[in-house]
Curated annotation (Swiss-Prot):
It catalyses: pseudouridine(1915) in 23S rRNA + S-adenosyl-L-methionine = N(3)-methylpseudouridine(1915) in 23S rRNA + S-adenosyl-L-homocysteine + H(+). Specifically methylates the pseudouridine at position 1915 (m3Psi1915) in 23S rRNA. It is an enzyme of class 2 (transferase). It comes from Enterococcus faecalis (strain ATCC 700802 / V583). Keywords: Cytoplasm, Methyltransferase, rRNA processing, S-adenosyl-L-methionine, Transferase. This is Ribosomal RNA large subunit methyltransferase H.
Length: 159
């Protein structure tokens, strides 16, 4: 299985990079995973609704440029479906069984995702109604993907 994570912005925090790299190393025995960072759109602190929409659209076009037609796309969205770790694992397993072996996960920028990215997605998922820094969500998502494979293979993992 090939897994791609498309994110907006460059990760700068060393502790997050180290955590992500640790889980990527652990994931190697289950799946090939790559992380693609697209540039975030520079914008002033205060934006009008039209300017926010424009920023999301520009970032959205960059995201869509990294997604292929044959990929099953999950986007992280606050209003997405909430899954337990076991349900998430089952979802990935079922996709693999049905022949969908190219999975892409998308984490938007600080303003969220454009409508065009949401429309391209096959599934919107959420890690709850709380708001998290999008950089931190990279680590959380990669850990959950790793956890999902451990669960799928019947291997022990902390609950």
């Amino acid at each position: 299985m090939k897994i791609k994570l498309v994110t907006v912005g460059k990760l700068k925090e060393k502790y997050l990079i180290q955590g992500i790299n640790e889980y990527l190393k652990r994931l190697n025995s289950y799946a090939k995973m790559e992380i693609i960072e697209v540039p975030d759109e520079k914008a002033p602190e205060k934006l009008s609704d039209a300017e926010m929409l424009q920023v999301k659209e520009k970032e959205g076009q960059r995201i869509l440029g990294k997604i292929n037609d044959n990929e099953y796309v999950f986007v992280l969205a606050i209003n997405g479906k909430q899954l337990s770790s076991e349900e998430f694992s089952k979802e990935i397993e079922q996709l693999g069984i049905s022949g969908k072996s190219n999975l892409t996960f998308v984490i938007g920028g600080s303003l969220g995702l454009s409508d065009s990215v949401l429309q391209r997605s096959n599934q919107q998922i959420s890690f709850g109604r709380l708001t998290y820094p999008h950089q931190l969500m990279r680590l959380v998502l990669v850990e959950q993907i790793y956890r999902g494979f451990r669960i799928m293979k019947g291997e022990p993992y902390h609950k």
